[in-house]
Regions:
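N-terminal glycine-rich anion-binding loops that anchor highly charged ligand groups
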Residues: 1, 13-26, 33-35, 73-76, ...
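Catalytic-core signal marking the mid-to-C-terminal active-site face
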Residues: 1-4, 12, 17-24, 343-463
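Glycine-rich, N-terminal phosphate-binding loop and its surrounding beta-alpha-beta segment
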Residues: 23-90
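Short acidic (Asp/Glu) and glycine-rich catalytic loops that position anionic groups and cofactors
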Residues: 26-31, 177, 215, 258-261, ...
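Short juxta-domain linker segments that transition from a proline/glycine-rich
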Residues: 74-78, 98, 107, 349, ...
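Helix-rich catalytic cores of soluble enzyme domains
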Residues: 94-321, 325
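Hydrophobic alpha-helical bundle architecture
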Residues: 278, 282-384
Length: 463
């Protein structure tokens, strides 16, 4: 598959809608003909070599700093849904209030390490101005690293400028606090909007997540080895371009590979074929020594049900087993990414907590071998009251916020609530208890002045 990726780049090539990018690749040794760039085997891989295998992202306080790459795993909420849903309101278009709510829920959760980007599309705001309110929400209501806009170079630059206002221009030049989520226009096309945004973030020494989005049978061949080779080729070209712009800039090699129902054209998630492809891409990205984006709680289900749990669980677990470092879409995803659900969001948060515990591995030491507990309990007794149990019971096992392990009688007395109903109560409780983190008044005023100035400079556009 790695050799086939080189074959794709050499024989088929990649279409790039940007003259500067084509010039950079030509100077680096690519064969450029019009918009088409072709690469000798190994060239793109060599150009990726300056990208760091791991890097830090910095939050507004040190407790929110994270490492991307190496043995670290970063959970990131859903990205891009235009709709939201909850038990009372059903499925509806998202608003800026919903966006702010999900930023707050993310801030409150110890299992979301990153504030995300377009957690949902606030369609009540003009298309050309909503990015300002989204970036402000990340900066104001969270302390965690986040993603900025990539839907135009102007919006990317606005996102970077707002980060500079908050963190300082000199600080931003040496500290990664913001990323751009760059999607390849599969198959094998880098469009002008994405390349412009990629260049903006790379020049600022901020991160990019380069992600081919490939449905087998639509944007790529139907067979998984071909999809893996295509995804690797596309992502490597994006990483290589960032390194030609600014060597050493922090990047994540992302993949979004899944199958589709070949009778209806609908995307499918958690399928064995997609999971096998994820395992393969994980091994190939390790050979490149780059951080990997994969996995997520993905599902085609419209509600929080058994299908949602099964598909989400399979996709997430496989991504983690494949070695994913950056897990976008880790909370809230429903309906193939069209919807972010409040109940699904907190349900996924709970699962991320469980996965985080599993990823810590098995510690073997004197305490966990518990020789004193065996001595105290002896044969034929139980361990409930021994000193070792008393000393370890609070941390011995992961305690779910949502799972019900009471008796049938107690569950009935408590209202016979199912998972979705318990999750509904949980997200409301979390928002009721949210308190915004401290924020400097002068920074807040400067951000608002910047937003007001940008909004006043252009008429509202809804397309």
């Amino acid at each position: 598959m790695e050799e086939h990726s080189d074959w794709i780049l050499d024989e088929i090539g990649v279409e790039i809608h940007d003259g500067e990018a084509l010039d950079l690749f030509r100077q680096a040794g690519a064969r450029v003909d019009g918009r088409q760039a072709r690469f000798e085997p190994g060239l793109v891989r060599a150009l990726c070599a300056t990208a760091p295998p791991a890097f830090q992202m910095f939050g507004r306080n040190s407790a929110s700093d994270i490492t991307v790459g190496g043995d670290s795993v970063v959970f990131v909420p859903a990205y891009g849904p235009p709709f939201v849903s909850d038990l009372e309101g059903g499925r509806r278009y998202a608003t800026i209030v919903d966006f702010e709510n999900f930023v707050k829920l993310t801030q409150l959760s110890p299992w979301m390490h990153h504030s995300g980007g377009t957690i949902c599309e606030p369609v009540d705001l003009p298309v050309n101005k909503r990015h300002l309110d989204m970036v402000y929400a990340h900066l104001r209501y969270s302390t965690k690293p986040f993603m900025g806009s990539v839907t135009s170079v102007e919006r990317a630059e606005d996102s970077l400028q707002m980060a500079r206002i908050c963190y300082g221009t000199d600080y931003l030049d040496n500290h990664c606090v913001i990323q751009g989520n760059i999607n390849v226009n599969s198959p094998l096309v880098f469009d002008r909007v994405m390349v412009d945004s990629l260049k903006a973030y790379a020049r600022a020494n901020q991160g990019c997540v380069i992600s081919p989005f490939i449905l087998g049978g639509a944007m790529g061949p139907v067979t998984q080895p071909a999809l893996v080779a295509q995804a690797l080729a596309e992502a490597m070209v994006g990483i290589a371009l960032t390194q030609l712009i600014r060597p050493g800039s922090p990047m994540v090699l992302g993949v979004f590979l899944t199958t589709m129902n070949l009778r209806t054209g609908a995307p499918t998630f958690g399928t064995p074929e997609a999971n096998l492809a994820t395992y393969a891409i994980g091994q190939l990205v390790r050979r490149l020594n780059l951080p990997l984006r994969a996995g997520g709680h993905l599902t085609s289900s419209k509600v929080l049900d058994a299908q949602a749990a099964q598909e989400s669980g399979d996709t997430m677990l496989v991504g983690l087993q494949a070695g994913a470092n950056f897990v976008l879409q880790a909370a809230g995803w429903l309906e193939g990414g069209l919807v972010i659900g409040y109940e699904k969001f907190v349900f996924d948060l709970d699962r991320c907590g469980s996965h985080s515990r599993m990823l810590t591995g098995l510690l073997v030491d004197d305490n966990t071998l518990a020789a004193d507990a065996f001595r105290e309990a002896g044969a034929g007794s139980n361990f409930l009251g021994v000193s070792h149990t008393m000393a370890n019971f609070e941390t011995a096992n992961y305690q779910s916020d949502l799972a019900d392990d009471t008796s049938f009688e107690q569950w009935s007395a408590d209202g016979s609530l199912d998972s979705a109903q318990r999750a509904n109560l949980r997200w409301k409780e979390m928002l009721a208890n949210y308190h915004p983190p401290p924020f400097e008044q002068d920074v807040d005023e400067e951000l608002r002045d910047f937003m007001d100035s940008k909004k006043a400079s252009d008429e509202d556009r809804w397309y």
